[in-house]
Each structure stands twice: as C-alpha cells, then as structure tokens.
UniProtKB/Swiss-Prot annotation:
Belongs to the shikimate dehydrogenase family. Involved in the biosynthesis of the chorismate, which leads to the biosynthesis of aromatic amino acids. Catalyzes the reversible NADPH linked reduction of 3-dehydroshikimate (DHSA) to yield shikimate (SA). It comes from Streptococcus pyogenes serotype M6 (strain ATCC BAA-946 / MGAS10394). This is Shikimate dehydrogenase (NADP(+)). Gene3D superfamilies: Leucine Dehydrogenase, chain A, domain 1, NAD(P)-binding Rossmann-like Domain. NADP(+) binds at residues 135-139, 236, 260. It is an enzyme of class 1 (oxidoreductase). Keywords: Amino-acid biosynthesis, Aromatic amino acid biosynthesis, NADP, Oxidoreductase. Pathway: Metabolic intermediate biosynthesis; chorismate biosynthesis; chorismate from D-erythrose 4-phosphate and phosphoenolpyruvate: step 4/7. Pfam families: SDH_C, Shikimate_dh_N. Homodimer. The gene is aroE.
Length: 292
C-alpha cells in the first residue's frame, strides 16, 4: 500500500471494537489496488464512548467514507446528517458516505443486500419462501427488511432480548404494512414456537453471535429432527468458518449450509460502490476470504 500513498490518497475507515478479526481492510485495499484507485482503508478501534469524536474526525479530515460495526451501528444514527430509506427503516447503519469529502454524512445499511446476494450466490432464492430468522440486532433487522423486499412469503423472527422486542415490533408492523410478506416476532426463549417455526421453514438464518467466540461451542439448534434434506441453514458468523450450528446441520443432512463469508464479501462490495462509485472486483476478492 505504501507505494501508492500520496498527498492525493483518499481515506476510508472502519469504526468498531474489536477490529482485529475484520476482513474489511484486506478486502477494500486489495480492491483499490486491483482497480488502480488512490484510496486507503484503515481500521480504528472505536467504541461508543469515542464515536462522536470519530465522526467529527470524518468531517474534519475529509475521510470519504466509513464502515461501522459493533457496537456502533445504532449509536451512530444521531451523529449523521441523513439516512438511506433502508437504514431509517432498520434503525442501524454500517456504511457512512461523506460525499465529495465536504462533511455531509449519509448513513446506509448494506447487511441485508449482502446476505441476500450471498444466498443467491449459493443458488438459494427467498421468493415465496417461509424463513425463520433468529437474532434481530442491526444485521438481523437489515436481513429481515431485505427478505421482505425480495418477496419472502413469511418471516418468523425470534429474539432473546426482551428489552429489544418492543422496538423490533415497530419494524414488524412497518414491514407488514409496506410489503406482502407476513412478518411475526416471538421470544427465542419460547423453544416450542422456535422449533415449530423451523419445522415449517425452507430457510433458517442465525443472525445472533452464538457460534463465535466466546460462544463457539454453542448452537441454537441441537435437535437433529429439526434438520431436514430440504432445509437451508445460513449462519452469518464467518469466524469460525464452520460454526457448531453449521457442523450440526451438515452432519444431519441439511440441503445446504452457508457461513457468513459471502455476506461479508457482498455487503462490503455494496459499501465499496457507495463510497467509490465503482464496482468491487468480487471475483478477485473472494480468494482473500478463505474457504466458504
């Protein structure tokens, strides 16, 4: 990267903590190099306490854009000037665009688009399908919105945090009003309802942190009877590449198991396009992500 840094180089950032596991710097910097773009992507260890100062830094330094990850995806909302329609609906942001570097910051959410492109890449269509989705944080809400926009027949949402259920219910109401998709919300602690939903679903999506450290030995599904030859299981965790859930689903004969690497690639590609105006060369970037 040092060979192409100059006084004209445009900076893009990542604001999150922890950041050491992130694949984004490698992906974006390789894409800049492939396309000959004079950009550089740097990750900054920023939590909610430092977030306001970091956002002001984007404005002051003319940083052209930033990716935003945990724990900042919702906390950044009041610090921005505008939101895309999807980001406003989801109530979370993972990409900030500073158009022309002039300090007007617009928040976008690309998680949902990334997830659906990853599924399509694996030959999985969501149109007219019944889908169970566990975990309705920033990423989960974005995926739910995109599933509804892309024509899912029914989305059964499950979430463990009772304090979040009321805010998610507002999203459920909006999706039922704006789309033809039937969307419901239940507590993940209700295992009877959870198991029934999976039995009736074509696709199960785990958008929780279960499966990644320190929860790498846990799985939301432990009953082999829930895994069927016509069930697709998608875990948005990408480290480890095969979570306990995916290993269990593979062992018991799921139609297909998909990890989060494809979602990382395609949400990154969408963010790349928003910030640079160029298409990320995804075929060249895929090998950097390792085995899917």
């Amino acid at each position: 990267m040092s060979e192409r840094l100059s006084g004209h180089t445009l900076l893009v950032s990542l604001l999150a903590t922890p950041i050491r596991h992130s694949l984004s710097p490698k992906m974006h910097n390789e894409a800049y190099a492939k396309l000959g773009l004079d950009y550089a992507y740097l990750a900054f260890e920023v939590g909610t306490e430092q977030l306001a100062d970091a956002v002001q830094g984007i404005r002051a330094l003319g940083i052209r854009g930033s990716n935003v990850s945990m724990p900042n995806k919702e906390a950044i909302l009041p610090l921005l000037d505008d939101l895309s329609p999807a980001a406003e609906l989801v109530g979370a942001v993972n990409t900030v665009v500073n158009k022309d570097g002039k300090g007007h910051l617009v928040g976008h959410i690309t998680d949902g688009i990334g997830a659906l492109r990853a599924l399509a890449d694996e030959g999985v269509s969501v149109k007219n399908k019944i889908i169970t989705l566990a975990g309705v944080g920033g990423a989960g809400k974005a995926i739910a919105v995109q599933l509804a926009f892309d024509g899912a027949k029914e989305i059964r949402l499950f979430n463990r945090q009772a304090t979040r259920l009321s805010s998610v219910q507002k999203l459920v109401t909006k999706l039922n009003q704006l789309t033809r998709t039937k969307v419901t919300l239940q507590d993940l602690e209700d295992q009877t309802a959870f198991k029934e939903a999976i039995r009736e679903s074509h696709l199960f999506i785990d958008a929780t942190s279960v499966g990644m450290k320190p929860l790498e030995n846990l799985s939301l599904i432990t009953d082999p009877e829930l895994i069927r030859p016509d069930l697709v299981v998608f875990d948005i965790v990408y480290s480890p590449a095969e979570t306990k859930l995916l290993a269990f689903a593979r062992q018991h004969g799921a139609q297909k198991v998909i990890n989060g690497l494809g979602m990382v690639l395609y949400q990154g590609a969408e963010a790349f396009k928003l910030i640079t105006g160029q298409d990320m060369p995804v075929d060249a970037i895929k090998p950097l992500l390792g085995d899917k």
